[in-house]
Amino acid sequence: MAELKFAQSLAVVIGINQYGNGIAPLRTAVADAEAVAATLAEHHGYEVLLLTDAQGQLGPLRSLIQERLPALVQAGGRLLLYFAGHGIAQDGDDGPAGYLIPQDAMPGEVSSYLPMVDLHDALTALPCRHFLAIFDCCFAGAFRWSSTRDIDFAPDVLHQERFDRFCLDPAWQVITSAAYDQKAMDVLSLRDDRGEIDSGPGQRPAEQHSPFAAALMQGLAGGADISPPAADGKPAGDGVITATELYLYLRDRVEVLTQAQRKRQTPEICSLRNHDKGEYVFLTPGHELNLPPAPELNRENNPYRGLESFDADHSDLFFGRDKEIEQLLARLDSPHPLTVVLGVSGTGKSSLVKAGLLPRLADRRPDFWVLPVMRPGNRPIKALAQICAELVPESEAKRLVRQLAKDEGALVDIVGRWHQANPDRKLLLVIDQTEELITQATSPREALQFQQLVKRVMAEHWSFLWIVATLRLDFEAQFQDEALHGEWMDARFVIPPMSQAQLRDAIEKPAAARVLYFEPHSLVDKLVEDVAQTPGALPLLSFALSELYLRYLERRSDNRALTEDDYRALGGVVGSLTQRATQEYEELVDEDDAYAHTVKRVMLRMVALEGGALARRRVPLSELVYDTPTENARVQTVLDRLIDARLVVRGQDGVAAGEAGGAAL
C-alpha cells in the first residue's frame, strides 16, 4: 500500500450538539465528528484530536488555534480541521462576516463567537505544507471571504508527476457544506421529517448523520475516487482522492439530496493565501496507485499553436471559449441558416469554429453532416466545388467547377439530391476567412458569383442547410451591400474580447494538459495583464507561450516549469514575436547578405493593402518562383526557416504569415 510522505498527519475534529444559553441543540454534529475522526484515524493514518460539546467552548477553541496548534503542527506536515456545529454570517464591509458558534456562545453577543477571519489568520500562520478545513455548519461559505482566490480545477487524468507536485507544493484549501447564504441540514429525511441517512460501510445502522457528513465519509472511503472509470476488470479510480475530487463528489450528492427536501445546500471550495501548486490528497483505502506518467515533452508536443489557428485535432488544447461555443451551437437550431462569425484580426474566429464548434457538434449532434472546412482562396468557385465533391458521385465531381460557374441552380440541385438520399441529416458548410473573397479572389465577378450561389442554396434549402462563415470585422462593410445583405443582420455573431478568466483558461489549461506549471504562479497574472488590454492579441499570446515552451526544452530541465525568467528574456508577449523574427532574419543575413532581399521579397508577397489597412495574404507557391535557381534555393531556405519558427504557416496550396505575424516580419 502506498504511503504519503508527510512529516505529520494531524486532524483536529470538532463536533458540538449540546449548546447552552438557549441556542438550539443539534442532533448529529457529535456523531458526525466521531465518525469522521474514526475514518481519518483508521483508514487514512491520521493522529486525531477530537473535541466535542463542552470542549468546543470559546476559551478552549481560542487556546487551540493560538497555542496548542502552533506547538503541535510540524513543518512539512499536513493538518485537517473539521468542524460540525452552528455557524452564522452577518453583513461586513467586504462581504459576509462569518462566525463559528462555540458551545458557550451567548445569542446576539458577537464577542462570544469565533470570527472566521480570526480562525483564518491563526491557521495560515501555521508551518504545515498542506492544510484542509472542512466546515459543516450554516453559512460556512462565509469563510471564503477570508480567503484569497478560487481553487484551480485539476485535469481529469492525474499523472505521477502532477501527483508528486501536489504533495510537494503548498496546498491550503477549504471545503464548506453550504454557501455563505445557506443553512446546513442537521439530519436529512428520506422517509419522513426526522428520518436518517445511512452513513455508509462500517458505521452503525441506526447512526444518523448530516447529508454532508454522510457523503464525506462515503467519499473518503473511496466513493470520490472515480477517475478514470472502471475498465478491463479494474475498479474505477487511480488510488488518489484530491480535495477537488472530494468537493465535486460532495457537491453532486449533497445538492441533489437537500434539493429533494426543498432545502438546497451547495458545498463550495476555495483556497487560502498560502496555497500554491499543491493539492490536498488522500489515498483511497484498499486501492493501489494507478498513475500514468506525464506525456513526453518535445517540439511536436507543444501545447500552444503559436501563430497557427486551432483545428479539430487540437480541440483538447482549445480553452476559454465555452460560452461562445454553446452560443454558436444554439444557432444551428435557429431559423437563420447563415452565421457570420465576426471579430478583429487575432480574436480567434477560425479556432472558435474549427476547434470549438465542430468537435462539440460532432459529439452532440450526429445528425449533422459537416463538409470539410473551406477557404475561398483565389478561385472561390473551384474551392466550393472541391468541398461539395463529396456530395455527388465520383463521376460528377470532375464537372463540378464548370457546373457551378455556369449555373446558379447547380448547387441547389446537388444539395437537394443529397438531402433526398439523407432525409434525416442536416448539412453544415463552413467558410473560413471569407475576406479572401476580397483579398485573394482573382476575379471580383467570381467572388460575387460565389456569394450568389451561397444565397440561393440557403433560400432553397433553409430547412436542413446551415452555413457558418468567419470574417474579419474590418471587411464587414464590403459584404453588407453585396448579395448577402438581406441576411446579414440576423447572421452577425461578433466575438467579444476574452475576459480575464477566459484568458487564464487559455493560458493554464493547455499547460495542465501537458503537466506543465508556471513558475511562479503569478506569471499567469502577468501574462493576462499583458494581453487583456490589447485587442486581437491572442496570436501574440499563443506565440509567446509557444516560445516559452521551447525555452523550457532548450534548458533541458526536469521540473516541467515555464518560468518568468524565460518570459522576460523573450521580451514579453509583444516582444517575443519581434525578437524571434529578428533572430531568424539576422541569422539568414549572417549566412549571406543576399537573404536580406529574399526575405523582403517573400514577406511583401504575404500582405495586401485593403481599405487602408494591411491584410494577410495566402501566397501560392507558384508566385514564389523566380528567374534563377540560386534565388529559388534562397526562397526555399527562407520559407523552411520561417515555417520551422512558426512565423509562417504552410497550407495545401501555399504559405501565409501567421495571424499577427505579417506586420512583425
What are these language model-derived features?
Residues M1-N301:
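Cysteine endopeptidase catalytic domains of the caspase/legumain-like
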Residues A154, R162-R165, G200, D225-D232, ...:
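Amphipathic helix/helix-loop-helix segment enriched in hydrophobic residues with interspersed Lys/Arg
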